[in-house]
Amino acid sequence: MRVSRYFGTDGIRGRVGQGLISADFVLRLGNALGRVLAQGRDTRPMVLIGKDTRISGYMFESALEAGLVAAGADVQLIGPMPTPAIAFLTNTLRADAGVVISASHNPHDDNGIKFFSAMGEKLDDATEAAIEAAIEAPFLTVDSEYLGKVKRTRDAIGRYIEFSKASVPRGFTLRGLKLVLDCAHGATYHIAPMLFRELGAELVAIGVDPDGLNINAGVGSTHLETLAATVRESGADLGIAFDGDGDRVLMTDAQGRTVDGDDLLYVLARAWRASGRLKGTVVGTLMSNYGLEQALGTLGIPFIRAKVGDRYVHQALVESGGVLGGEASGHLLCLDRATTGDGIVSALQVLEVLRHEGLTLSQALLGLHKVPQKTVNVCWSGPARAAVEMPEVRQALVEAQAAVQGRGRVFLRPSGTEPVVRITVEADDVVLMQQTLDRLADVVRDAA
């Protein structure tokens, strides 16, 4: 496996103004991308740039633009748009690459850079390696007659709305359904309410007033308590929450109970199996609840686990010929409808199943019985990867695994996007699960 100097599991991410997430580095990053794309061609490459609603996005947009133009690449500025919208637009506008400035579900003082290929897919390892090598080379400014040009794309919202609506049948409607939509003050704030209203839903929209600083703050897919309370207070049929860049979706049922990515995978897999839409293997991750695997097995649906990260789920789907996969966090991949995880498109697929079958969300989940599972994040001041190598942590992990042997699973892993260690314990008994989790988390905290 290639060891990356700059790229993490989902692009480059960190605290604004520190390390790689600085204007000068992003300037060099844009220049490196432009040089890689220009290799072996006579015409200027074209790159789309989108962003979420963080205030630092303006700074990094300008830096990327300058670096690309200096390398001789044309740029189209999309503005605030969901990450999957940039993937779609990169493909449909025939761009050579797409770039998204976002830190997804992280707070406003983080930011990051994600890349898409010309086909709207995550970059492969070889392209990432070429960009990293170009970053280390001297900055290139081409002669003035070869500098890139910049323009702003005006019809991006309409294009993406039509793409999203095309992911469900022509006669699909949300009339008679009351929804609460939480857009996390993020990239879906102006698109998702418009789209769901066009489809006929009665809508209560929250998290739709971004100010550059409030993205993911107490709202969105990482703070479902806000959505749940609004669903109960408004008497809605269900709630839908996106994260800051719109590539994740979670839901709540009419009682405000959380419906996570494992739940949504079950709803889709069961219905698609019955309709003949399901192809190949359903792909989850090492963190997917064992109850999901059991429920799919009962239905005769093959299920495999990939490493944590939507790029690994995507890779496993391609290798197995599957079309459906995802993570409990809400990254869902419906590869017969979109090239990457798309919160809006995934939500529409779930709603289409519910409308077609005449079921509520809670009714659609009656065949799924999940094993008690809980995850805690322990802050780690240094490189989080070092935590799993510490002798006392490794010993505590062995003891935790022994405690649940035959009754559950234990996972300890460094986050690929945040300075935390994630600890997950799954067991058939909730008391055993909590005790095992507490003991292991205490050891990790003491070692931090």
Curated annotation (Swiss-Prot):
The active site is at 104 (phosphoserine intermediate). Gene3D superfamilies: Alpha-D-Glucose-1,6-Bisphosphate, subunit A, domain 3 (3.40.120.10), Alpha-D-phosphohexomutase, C-terminal domain (3.30.310.50). PANTHER family: PHOSPHOGLUCOMUTASE (ALPHA-D-GLUCOSE-1,6-BISPHOSPHATE-DEPENDENT), PHOSPHOHEXOSE MUTASE. Binds 1 Mg(2+) ion per subunit. InterPro entries: A-D-PHexomutase_a/b/a-I, A-D-PHexomutase_a/b/a-I/II/III, A-D-PHexomutase_a/b/a-II, A-D-PHexomutase_a/b/a-III, A-D-PHexomutase_C, A-D-PHexomutase_C_sf, A-D-PHexomutase_CS, Alpha-D-phosphohexomutase_SF. Its cofactor is Mg(2+). Activated by phosphorylation. It catalyses: alpha-D-glucosamine 1-phosphate = D-glucosamine 6-phosphate. GO terms for cellular component: cytosol. GO terms for biological process: carbohydrate metabolic process; peptidoglycan biosynthetic process; UDP-N-acetylglucosamine biosynthetic process. Mg(2+) binds at residues 104, 243, 245, 247. Its EC number is 5.4.2.10. GO terms for molecular function: magnesium ion binding; phosphoglucosamine mutase activity; phosphomannomutase activity. Belongs to the phosphohexose mutase family. It comes from Xylella fastidiosa (strain 9a5c). The modification Phosphoserine is found at residue 104. This is Phosphoglucosamine mutase.
